[in-house]
Swiss-Prot record:
Belongs to the cysteine-rich repeat secretory protein family. Keywords: Repeat, Secreted, Signal. Residues 22-126, 132-240 form the Gnk2-homologous domain. It comes from Arabidopsis thaliana. One of its GO terms (cellular component) is extracellular region. This is Cysteine-rich repeat secretory protein 55. Residues 1-20 form the signal peptide. The keyword Aminoacyl-tRNA synthetase does not apply. The gene is CRRSP55. Its main location: secreted. InterPro entries: CRR_secretory_protein (IPR050581), GNK2 (IPR002902), GNK2_sf (IPR038408).
Length: 263
C-alpha cells in the first residue's frame, strides 16, 4: 500500500468526552486491486460480529474468518483505548463495525479509527506486524506561550519517555498515561497506546516514530495527536483521558483544515 500521511491543522476541542459515533479517520485501500467477493464479504460480516461481541470484555480481540476450504480468509483486529469502560468500548466497536462497512464498501482491506477504539480487517495477515505506513496527525494551531520553548521540549520529552516505558510492559497492555506540571497553573497531559498484538520492540518503535512528530509537525504546539494503525500518542494542556476532571474541561471550539501528503 502506498504510504499516506494526513496532517490536520486543528484548534482542538477543550473537552475529550468524544462521542464514539464521531470517527477520526478511515482508510479504505481503494488503490488495491483486491475487492471483496461475495464470500469474502460474508466472511467480513462474520468477523465483525465476532469483534463486536468479544472485544469489550478485554478491550482487545484478533480473529479470522474463512469459508469451509479456508480460502478467502479475512483477518481482523479491534482494540479500545485502555482507559475507557467496557460499555463505552462496546458502543465504539459497534459504531466502528457499522460505519466501516458503509465507508469502505466492497473493500477487503479497511481500517477505521475513533477516539475510543480502532478496528481493522484485511485479507493479508497483518496481525503482529508493525504498521506505520499510513497515519493521521492532529495539532492545535496555537503555540505554547506559558513556558520557555526549550523547557517545554524537555518536559514533553521526559513525560513521554516515562509513559512509553510503562506502555511496553506486558502488564500495562500497551497503555501509558501521565501528567506533569509545567507551571503552578498549567499541566501537560499525555497518553500512548499500541495495539496489543505487537511485540515490546515493535511497540517501542511505533511510539518512537509517532513521538518524532512532536519535534516537527507539532513542535511548540499546545496539543498534538499522532495516529497510526499500530499506535497512538497524544498530549494536551487539558485533561483528556479518564478519569476526567470536570472542573478543568470546557466547551468545544475550533477550526479544521487538512492537507494530504504522499510520496
Amino acid at each position: 500500500m502506498k504510504t499516506l500521511v494526513v496532517k490536520c491543522f486543528l484548534l482542538l476541542a477543550l473537552v475529550c468526552s468524544c462521542r464514539a459515533a464521531d470517527s477520526i479517520w478511515q482508510l479504505c485501500n481503494t488503490n488495491s486491486n483486491i475487492s471483496a467477493s461475495s464470500q469474502v464479504s460474508k466472511n467480513i460480516d462474520s468477523l465483525l460480529a465476532t469483534l463486536v461481541s468479544k472485544t469489550p470484555s478485554k478491550g482487545f480481540k484478533t480473529t479470522t474468518s474463512s469459508s469451509y476450504n479456508n480460502k478467502e480468509k479475512v483477518y481482523g483486529l479491534a482494540q479500545c483505548r485502555g482507559d475507557i469502560s467496557n460499555t463505552d468500548c462496546s458502543t465504539c466497536i459497534q459504531d466502528a463495525a457499522k460505519k466501516i462497512r458503509e465507508v469502505c464498501q466492497n473493500q477487503s482491506d479497511s481500517r477505521i479509527l475513533y477516539d475510543f477504539c480502532f478496528l481493522r480487517y484485511s485479507q493479508e495477515n497483518f496481525i503482529g506486524k508493525l504498521d506505520t505506513g499510513a497515519g493521521l496527525i492532529y495539532f492545535n494551531v496555537a503555540n505554547v506561550t506559558e513556558i520557555d520553548p526549550k523547557k517545554f521540549d524537555n518536559e514533553l520529552g521526559a513525560l513521554f519517555d516515562k509513559i512509553r516505558s510503562e506502555a511496553v510492559l506486558p502488564k500495562n497492555k500497551g497503555l501509558g498515561k501521565g501528567k506533569t506540571k509545567l507551571t503552578p497553573f498549567v499541566t501537560l497531559n499525555g497518553l500512548v497506546q499500541c495495539t496489543r498484538d505487537l511485540s515490546e520492540l515493535d511497540c517501542a518503535q511505533c511510539f518512537a516514530t509517532a513521538v518524532g512528530s512532536f519535534m516537527t509537525t507539532c513542535h511548540n504546539k499546545k496539543g498534538c495527536r499522532v495516529l497510526y494503525s499500530s499506535c497512538y500518542v497524544r498530549y494536551e494542556f487539558y485533561p483528556f483521558y479518564f478519569p476526567l476532571d470536570p472542573a478543568k474541561t470546557g466547551p468545544s471550539v475550533g477550526r479544521i483544515s487538512s492537507v494530504h501528503l504522499s510520496p
